[in-house]
């Protein structure tokens, strides 16, 4: 009802993905990002996305997303946040571009061999994986996409600039792969989680479930 009636409300979800189950697998919302993002694709009676969904990559991007949510008076907003420590994005990152829903974190001046895209804490994993790929001679672009809904509201030329049609795009998500399938395109691939999580420290889970720089490297090499 809130989404249909354009009522302003903010929902903050502070335990995303599978990394919060160290004291038992009782609250790992692997599936919930996909459920929330479905509401972003549903229009209200005024033709707007019925919900603004934002999953920021680090503390600075969270500041931008918080401002977007506070300024959104037309629809409810949902912020999907992480509880574990997250590496900051590379120095010099233009965080203001997050207001467009998706933007280039690194590799903007090159014709990339592959584009890496994620939201939330997975972006920092892509940064680490990109370092391995670049050491292997590859040209890599990294895209942070806190809000697909905002990104799809940008002009087609901007969308093409960030994620060109026909590009090789690899997506990493700690939720269901469907979270990024609309971004990677026909030539892309998504590595995600298709089951509920486990009870263990988050760094152990990252390693066991493949959310590491090395697996980003392996997955991209396999895709190409």
Feature-to-residue mapping (PLM):
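TRNA-recognition modules of translation machinery and tRNA-sensing kinases, especially anticodon-binding
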Residues: 57
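Thiamine diphosphate
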Residues: 17-38, 42-52, 62, 70-224
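Single conserved hydrophobic/aromatic residue that forms the stacking wall/gate
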Residues: 1-12
């Amino acid at each position: 009802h809130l989404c249909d009636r354009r009522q302003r409300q903010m929902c903050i979800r502070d335990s995303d993905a599978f990394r919060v189950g160290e004291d038992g697998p009782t609250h790992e919302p692997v599936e919930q990002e996909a459920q929330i993002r479905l509401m972003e694709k549903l229009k209200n009676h005024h033709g707007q996305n019925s919900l603004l969904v934002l999953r920021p990559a680090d503390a600075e991007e969270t500041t931008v997303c918080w401002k977007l949510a506070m300024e959104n008076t037309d629809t409810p907003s949902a912020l999907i946040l992480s509880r574990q420590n997250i590496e900051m994005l590379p120095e010099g990152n233009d965080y203001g571009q997050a207001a467009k829903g998706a933007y280039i974190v690194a590799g903007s001046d090159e014709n990339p061999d592959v584009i890496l895209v994620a939201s939330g804490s997975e972006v920092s994993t892509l940064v680490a994986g990109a370092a391995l790929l670049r050491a292997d001679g590859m040209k890599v672009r990294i895209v942070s996409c806190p809000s697909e809904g905002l990104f799809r509201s940008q002009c087609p030329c901007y969308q093409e600039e960030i994620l060109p049609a026909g590009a090789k795009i690899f997506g990493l998500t700690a939720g269901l792969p469907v979270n990024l399938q609309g971004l990677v395109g026909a030539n892309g691939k998504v590595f995600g989680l298709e089951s509920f999580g486990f009870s263990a420290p988050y760094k152990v889970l990252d390693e066991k479930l493949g959310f590491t720089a090395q697996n980003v490297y392996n997955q991209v090499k396999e895709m190409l």
